[in-house]
Amino acid sequence: MCEFNVILNGKTQFKDVIYAKAEGGGVTVKNILGEAKEFKGCKIVEVDVSSTTLVLAP
């Protein structure tokens, strides 16, 4: 399985993400433990499987 680290403003904000959904002017992510975090006002700008990063921008 591939888990991603969520990067915002060059810093890791959330780890082990297996789900991401852009909705309502933001992005909701969930990790392997089922914990969720919403990044309001952000959008997904890059997904890199080789470096396991999901990059967000405001």
Predicted segment positions?
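Compact, glycine-rich, soluble single-domain proteins
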Residues: 5-8, 13-58
